[in-house]
């Protein structure tokens, strides 16, 4: 029983090490984590960010509208 438990612990530790290694290689997600949204009076489609008070930086957002508790952010 102790050998089986030790083997499971070794396998679990190895899995954690390899998972952490893969996460370090991926510098950032290649896509936005936002859903499409529409605000009245604004043309086009915005990005709906869930449970955020402001639009995140780095995406070029210039305007927004609130859809409580979310925010719809519009680029340019």
From Swiss-Prot:
Record has Glycosyltransferase as a keyword:
no
What are its GO biological-process terms? regulation of blood pressure
Residue interval(s) of motif Cell attachment site = 45-47
Describe tissue expression.
Answer: Moderately expressed in the ectodermal tissue from the distal and proximal tentacles, body wall, and oral disk.
Q: Which UniProt keywords apply?
A: Cleavage on pair of basic residues, Disulfide bond, Hypotensive agent, Ion channel impairing toxin, Nematocyst, Neurotoxin, Potassium channel impairing toxin, Secreted, Signal, Toxin, Voltage-gated potassium channel impairing toxin
- This protein's major location comes to secreted
Cell compartment(s), UniProt: Secreted; Nematocyst
Q: Which InterPro entries match?
A: BDS_K_chnl_tox, Myo_ane_neurotoxin_sf
Q: Name one GO molecular function term.
A: ion channel inhibitor activity
- Signal peptide annotation: 1-19
Gene3D superfamilies, sorted: Anthopleurin-A
Pfam families per UniProt: Defensin_4
- Spell out the GO cellular component terms annotated for this protein, sorted alphabetically and separated by semicolons: extracellular region; nematocyst
| Residue pairs linked by disulfide bridges in the UniProt entry | 37-72, 39-65, 55-73
Supply the residue numbers of the propeptide(s) excised during maturation.
20-31
* Stated family: Belongs to the sea anemone type 3 (BDS) potassium channel toxin family.
Tell me, in a sentence or two, what this protein's role is. Is member of a fraction that shows antiangiogenic activity, since it inhibits human microvascular endothelial cells (HMEC) tubulogenesis. This protein could be a kunitz-type inhibitor with a RGD motif that could block angiogenesis in binding on integrins. Blocks Kv3 voltage-gated potassium channels. Reduces blood pressure.
Q: What else is known?
A: In contrast to BDS-1, may have an alpha-helix which could be located at the C-terminal domain.
Q: What is this protein called?
A: Kappa-actitoxin-Avd4e
């Amino acid at each position: 029983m102790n050998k089986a438990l030790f083997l499971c612990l070794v396998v679990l530790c190895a899995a954690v090490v390899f998972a952490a290694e893969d996460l370090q290689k991926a510098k950032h997600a290649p896509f936005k984590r936002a859903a499409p949204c529409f605000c009245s009076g604004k043309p086009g489609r915005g990005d709906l960010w869930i449970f955020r008070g402001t639009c995140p930086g780095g995406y070029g957002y210039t305007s927004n509208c609130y859809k409580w508790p979310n925010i719809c952010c519009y680029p340019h």
